[in-house]
Curated annotation (Swiss-Prot):
Residues 198-218, 231-300, 593-623, 980-1007, 1024-1048 are annotated as: Disordered. The lineage of its organism: Eukaryota, Metazoa, Chordata, Craniata, Vertebrata. Interacts with RTN4R. This is Dyslexia-associated protein KIAA0319-like protein. Residues 1-29, 950-1048 are cytoplasmic. The chain crosses the membrane at residues 30-50, 929-949. The gene is Kiaa0319l.
Length: 1048
């Protein structure tokens, strides 16, 4: 149960004040001050205000907290910042965990075993902090850090949290499956049945701190769940010595128990001002130790609740149209003979709009049917005789996969016919449809007249040109995203040029009224496909004998005059280039005269103020059915001495006016001498002029990127009216900024392209008498608060080609790269960068609470993601990505140029071009020029030494001489001569055979077969000329050789 309250003091601060003040009244005055000092000291020590004992333990992001029982979860009243919420929890001894959920602060009392359980939430703004206040995690009733199977049951080990882009790395708690199984086996082997001894259950004296709620269970109590059965009345409160005085025990209602009996539960008697609901979350139940009902029950042994290991199986995943599944619960240990377990299935998590049917909710197997797509989480509770356990399982229902339907090729028009000189047309195939999308169009000309090349295109709309007469048949084949195809045909007929006869048009019938007796007829609306060569007007035979004068009878316009009352019919004949003719007739009706008197109009009354003493009288708006032939202006009333100029015209001028009222009468006449009169009043007043008053609405404050402003001076006033406005800019104002539509001469001044700074403008108003007045106002332009977080991207596209639809696609692609929603990317400005590129400024924020992401992090992440993706991931190639304001630190050896967005290094420093080219591409000033010169010199010297060494080794290798081999291939003749030679004497060496190779020529080949040179001659160094030349190639003592060696 939750409570909403302020910062809660410690229980000791409630008990000690009453004790101190009641006791101090009984003391003598001499000891009153000493006793009061002692009480204040004890009170200060009991407030737990020392936050040094408050050590923060684990912090879980995206997690919430649920508690068992009542008064364990409290919501602090009011809106507190995070640091105030944490400080309040540190000061409160009953606060062991802090749950911060979207600006709301919840404190949890986890002093009882297993009273606080974390769970995963879908909110990214949820954070759970566990404090260590001189107690271990087990003592506080929270999960120990090694109890990771419970975290797996909450879904933190199987589901990766949503990636928090730009704000931090994702938090994922995972446990290997082998470790999970070992923990389950260890828990199964535990002996959970422990019966406390009589001495341990004896009542002990409770001091003030114990009465304040400082009853912390031991770690053994956390691991062993003990329930105490008892019978209590629903309206009776039993005070026990084991619990504080402000805690009462009431029976907990159960659906299987009567209102007068049940299991007692502890409920605090403290009252909170208001109650506030908590976020809805799944309910996890754990058995907790309960206090003894009475001191007499401590001597009897308590039943022990065994913990059951319950498994609902692995998560189930089905795909529609299959919408049924059966969940089975498995329990260890199995029920004893004669004992059965009760099962209770509960739906914890489900989709927003879901439906389905559940059967056998209280059996071991749960049957689900008619499920809708989404994620369902079920909890099964198993109870037996003094045994309890829970299990969880997820069921995921996926929507039915889409079945592809082949596309439908549609051409429009399917049949088309044109005639020369029209030689081009189009056939539209873009109306072809598919259940997903069409990825390819292919047009093929199946039949047509003989031409140079047939038509074959891959576009949705086929554009045809330079057609020749004949019949064409075109085939359209469409391919959808799944590779299915469909085809259709379109027919086109091109006819030869046809010369159609002309179409004569003499115009509509005309009606005139005497005395008008002339009119012009027009036949230029006549048409022909190749042009008209002649026009001829004539009087119709039905109008022969009527008097009329005709001019231009062989032109498109016929002029008629001297017509009399009656009907005239005229005939127009037109001839084209082929000599074909067409005729048309038109009738002119001449009506008799019907004259009406004219209508005089002298115009509106006028009011003048001296020194203006003249005005004009306008009667030009007078009308007549025929025409007005005369005007006459006369003074009917008023002071004498005025002069009328042009009194016989429609517009007259009156001069010499004095103060007073004048009445002037206008008389008009028509041709039949019919007349009409009208009067106009002219009032002349004395001059009383007041200077004008200039007034501007007020100062204007503009915050960039809004760069327009409006200054309203229309509240300026004058008794006669303001004739001119003039806005001027003060000399101290920034020169940037433009005036729109010459509004500096109008009451309202419109400004654009303002820059940061303060503008001062002066308004000068002038009346008809030349008197003027001025007013002053300021326009303060504040800098853009998002300027440091703005990111600019240069796109390779003309700004006129970037449509709103393409802009939306680009924003969605950038959102995918950054891992944010489309609505989180706010485009501030799109403007041309060059003739073929466009610059787009945007920033990224999360929704809510609209926290801006850092611009340099957004730019860096966008660059990194684009390097990982393909070059054409974005619909337009990104030429450059950077922040609007240059935020490079230049390695603290230079400054950043705001125009080029690159570092300008200090003297003796230069850019690390290797890092720029191979890594992040950001400009820097990391290298010292001196070190670069030294390193370059060392590299050049090392390369020179290496090159010299390589050349020397190569020359030495080439200088070693190579001994040429001297061999001769034995033939049959040589072998026979070797066999016929006599054997040498003992001790003498065998004579060498005759050699005749290209390298060693013997003179024996030229003389005779008896001349034989022996090897001893060679051993003595007497080589014959002609064998190896005159230059010796080296001599070495010869060893005794065999016959074959001597031959070789």
């Amino acid at each position: 149960m939750e409570k909403r309250l302020g910062v809660k003091p410690s229980p000791a601060s409630w008990v000690l004040p009453g004790y101190c003040w009641q006791t101090s009244v009984k003391l003598p005055r001499s000891l009153y001050l000493l006793y009061s000092f002692f009480c204040f000291s004890v009170l200060w020590l009991s407030t737990d205000a020392d936050e040094s004992r408050c050590q923060q333990g684990k912090t879980l992001y995206g997690a919430g907290l649920r508690t068992e029982g009542e008064n364990h979860l409290r919501l602090l009243a009011g809106s507190l910042p995070f640091h105030a919420c944490r400080a309040a929890c540190c000061r409160d001894s009953a606060c062991h965990a802090l749950w911060w959920l979207e600006g709301m602060c919840f404190q949890a009392d986890c002093s009882k075993p297993q009273s606080c359980q974390p769970f995963r939430t879908d909110s990214s703004n949820s954070m759970l902090i566990i404090f260590q206040k001189s107690q271990t995690t087990d003592d506080l009733g929270l999960l120990p850090e090694d109890d990771e199977p419970h975290l797996l049951r909450l879904g933190w080990g199987r589901t990766s949290w949503r990636r928090q882009s730009l704000l931090g790395a994702p938090l994922t708690l995972s446990v290997p499956s082998s470790h999970h199984q070992s923990l389950l086996r260890d828990r199964q082997k535990r002996d959970l049945s422990v019966v406390p001894t009589h001495g341990a259950m004896q009542h002990s004296k409770v001091n003030h701190s114990e009465e304040a709620g400082a009853l912390s269970p031991t770690s053994a109590e956390v691991r062993k769940t003990i329930t105490v059965a008892g019978s209590f009345t629903s309206n009776h409160t039993t005070q026990t010595p084991e619990w504080p005085k402000n805690v009462s025990i009431h029976p907990e209602p159960s659906e299987h128990s009567s209102p007068v009996s049940g299991t007692p539960q502890v409920k605090s008697t403290e009252h909170s001002p208001t109650d506030a609901p908590l976020p809805v979350a799944p309910s996890y139940s754990y058995a907790t130790p309960t206090p003894q009902a009475s001191s007499q029950s401590t001597s009897a042994p308590h039943p022990v609740v065994k913990e059951l290991v319950v498994s609902a199986g692995k998560s189930v995943q089905i795909t529609l149209p299959k919408n049924e599944v059966q969940l089975n619960a498995f329990v260890l240990p199995e029920a004893e003979p004669g004992e059965t377990y009760t099962y209770d299935w509960q739906l914890i998590t489900h989709p927003t709009d879901y439906s389905g049917e559940v059967e056998r909710k209280h059996s071991q197997s749960l049957q689900l049917s008619k499920l809708t797509p989404g994620l369902y989480e079920f909890k099964v509770t198993v109870d037996g005789q003094n045994a309890h356990g829970e299990g969880y399982v997820n069921v995921t229902v996926k929507p039915e996969p889409r079945k592809n339907r082949p596309p439908v090729a549609v051409v429009s028009p399917q049949f088309q016919e044109i005639s020369l000189p029209t030689t081009s047309t189009i056939i539209d195939g873009s109306q072809s449809t598919d259940d997903d999308k069409i990825v390819q169009y292919h047009w093929e000309e199946l039949k047509g007249p003989l031409r140079e090349e047939k038509i074959s295109e891959d576009t949705a709309i086929l554009k045809l040109s330079k057609l020749v007469p004949g019949n064409y048949t075109f085939s359209l084949t469409v391919v959808d995203s799944d590779g299915a195809t469909n085809s259709t045909t379109a027919s086109l007929t091109v006819n030869k040029a046809v010369d159609y006869p002309p179409v004569a048009n003499a115009g509509p019938n005309q009606v005139i009224t005497l005395p008008q007796n002339s009119i012009t007829l027009f036949g230029n609306q006549s048409t022909d496909d190749h042009g008209i060569t002649s026009y001829e007007w004539s009087l119709s035979p039905s109008s022969k004998g009527k008097v009329v004068e005709m001019q231009g009878v062989r032109t498109p316009a016929l002029q008629l005059s001297a017509m009399q009352e009656g009907d005239y019919t005229y005939q127009l004949t037109v001839t084209d280039t082929a000599g074909q003719q067409a005729t048309a007739q038109v009738t002119v009706i001449v009506q008799p005269e019907n004259n009406k008197p004219p209508q005089a109009d002298a115009g509106p009354d006028k009011e003048l103020t001296l020194p203006v003493d003249s005005t004009t009288l306008d009667g030009s708006k007078s009308t007549d059915d025929q025409r007005v032939v005369s005007y006459l202006w006369e003074q009917s009333r008023g002071p004498d001495g005025v002069q009328l100029e042009n009194a016989n015209s429609s517009v007259a001028t009156v001069t010499g006016l004095q103060v007073g009222t004048y009445v002037f009468t206008l008389t008009v006449k028509d041709e039949r001498n019919l007349q009409s009169q009208s009067s106009v009043n002219v009032i002349v007043k004395e001059e009383i002029n007041k200077p004008p008053v200039a007034k501007i609405a007020g100062n204007v404050v503009v915050t960039l990127p809004t760069s327009t402003a409006e200054l309203d001076g229309s509240r300026s006033s004058d008794d006669k009216g303001i004739v001119s406005y003039l806005w001027t800019r003060d000399e101290t104002s920034p020169a940037a900024g433009e005036v729109l539509n010459h509004s500096d001469h109008h009451p309202v001044l419109f400004l654009s392209n303002l820059v940061e700074g303060t503008y001062t403008f002066h308004l000068k108003v002038t009346d008809a008498k030349g008197e003027s007045d001025t007013d002053r106002t300021t326009v303060e332009v504040k800098p853009d608060p998002r300027k440091s977080n703005l990111v600019e991207i240069i796109l390779d596209v003309n700004v006129s080609q970037l449509t709103e639809r393409l802009k939306g696609m680009l924003i969605r692609q950038i959102g995918v790269l950054l891992g944010v929603l489309d609505s989180d990317i706010i485009v501030q400005k799109i403007q041309p960068y060059t003739e073929q590129s466009t610059k787009m400024l945007f920033f990224v924020q999360n929704d809510p609470p609209h926290q801006l992401f850092k611009g340099h992090e957004v730019a860096a992440m966008l660059k990194s993601e684009l390097q990982k993706q393909k070059a054409d991931f974005l619909i337009f190639r990104a030429l450059e990505i950077s922040t609007v304001t240059c935020q490079l630190n230049c390695s603290d050896h230079g400054h950043c140029d705001s125009f080029t967005k690159r570092c300008v290094c200090d003297p003796f420093w230069m850019e690390n071009f290797i890092k720029v080219q191979l890594r992040d591409g950001d400009s820097n000033c990391e290298w010292s020029v001196l070190y670069v010169i030294i390193a370059s010199f060392v590299i050049v010297v090392a390369l020179g030494i290496l090159s010299w060494t390589t050349i020397c080794c190569c020359k030495r290798q080439k200088g070693k001489p190579k001994r040429k081999s001297r061999y001769k291939i034995l033939d049959a003749t040589d072998q026979e001569s070797l066999e016929l030679k006599p054997t040498s004497r003992a001790g003498s060496k065998q004579k060498g055979p005759t050699l005749s190779s290209s390298l060693m020529h013997s003179e024996s080949e030229l003389d005779s077969d008896d001349a034989i040179f022996t090897w001893p001659d060679r051993e003595k160094g007497k080589l014959l000329y002609g064998q190896n030349g005159s230059v010796p190639n080296g001599q070495t003592p010869l060893k005794s050789r065999s016959a074959r060696e001597e031959i070789l």
